[in-house]
Amino acid sequence: MRRDFVVCTDVKELVEKFAEAASEAIGVAQLKLATLAIDAVKWLVSKWRRGRVAVLVDDAFQAIGLEKAAMYVKALLSLVEYPPEGYERVVAIVATSEGFSGWEIGRHLWANIMPMWNMSKRGFEELYEKIPAPKPDFEEAWRLTGGNPRMLSQLYEAEWDVERVVEGLIKAKGLRDMVKKWRDCLEKVVEDPDNLFQEDFPKELKDELIARNLIVYDMYPREAKFWIDEPPPERDAELGIGRDVAWQSPLCREAVKGAME
């Protein structure tokens, strides 16, 4: 990274800062690297004063922790409102798959929050076509994943062994312990995810499902103006999509089923 970055940018000072942060103790380094991304924008534009700069930070909220998510977005907002001298505008786009982080940020009104569903069927088919054969037919791949590209890649890596992927999800999400505690409620959520939206359902279960990234809760209206790209259907029982709650992917629902069995 150091070699390529120096050759491409000739900004050795910035490389030194990133390398120094990365060499520190884990945890401290993650936070410092995430905040350095903001500093990097200011530094680059003050040095170059030309062209455009893009800084991409992946999984920032996982690295810095939910409690710092709002502060991080506020720092990005400061860049937007007060761009470095010589720059006309700054655009900040922050994406997260963590359900709780959206609520943490949204309560401060520092960002315009828009949901993005899995890939549209047309876009997903383009991705599917690039995967080499042998493979199941497209409709089967769509039925299993609901357009989730990560689930598609897991199926491909598992040589389309659905049971292997499901068992991996059960282990990774710790679903057997959750089923022991919430079996009766989970049976209803597997039957229809909107059951989770009922008042008599335990909040603790809802929070667990969100924290384990198994569901999307309190879905936006399906009008295109509320969504980035194509919104999901109003309801689709086969894909596990309800009006207010949806499984992240049909395979997430299958994993909960598998844990119950």
Model regions and ranges:
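Amphipathic alpha-helical "lid/sensor" segments that cap RecA-like P-loop NTPase cores
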Residues: 133-185, 203-211, 219
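Conserved AAA+ ATPase "sensor/coupling" helix adjacent to the nucleotide-binding pocket
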Residues: 110, 126-133, 158
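Conserved Walker B catalytic segment
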Residues: 30-108
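Conserved NTP-binding/hydrolysis module of P-loop NTPases
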Residues: 1-31
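C-terminal leucine-rich, beta-strand-based interaction scaffolds used for sensing/assembly
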Residues: 6, 172-261
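A short helix-turn-beta junction within AAA+ P-loop NTPase domains corresponding to the substrate/partner-engaging
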Residues: 2-3, 104-122
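Short loop/turn segments at strand-loop or loop-helix junctions that form parts
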Residues: 2-5, 55-61, 220
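Non-catalytic recognition/regulatory regions in large multidomain proteins
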Residues: 62-65, 85, 130-138, 143
